[in-house]
Amino acid sequence: MNIDMTKIANIILYMLHKQVKALNHKKIELLIFFCELNHLNFCGKKILGETFIKTSRGVKAEILDELFTLILDEVEFEDEEDDRVFFIQELMDFLEIEIIEKERFKELKFSKLDEDFDETIFTSDELKSIHKVINLYKDTSVRNLSNECFSLEKVRKSENGAIVL
């Protein structure tokens, strides 16, 4: 697993700072997808190293989705050396993560702990991509973000389960 959890946590802190509406784990995954896509298109590389897979409802982040599912399911780990334990702990060093029970599903809500968004860990180009995407989509619903994924030819033409980014 080659993903930068410190940068992910800081992007979530930035989303909280910018008061992204209805911010839950699904919206975070989609906003990160668009950040990665924007940066790849303009700079030729990803910011975080996350892989995105097409689903029937849009795209999901391979590692982040697994981590969020483990948190939602309140999984207890047998092996403390499991990378996922480290990744989840790193997120929780920056963020309070609360499981919210809805009528038909559960979702994760995030709030800031003591740390503020640290822009020094990003390059100026990475910051431009993050600012652009978050400002563009901060008021967009999860459903509309998912629909936006399908406006991309690469997503539309891929089979479910295929890597799209």
Which residues make up each language-model segment?
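Domain-edge interaction signal
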Residues: 1-165
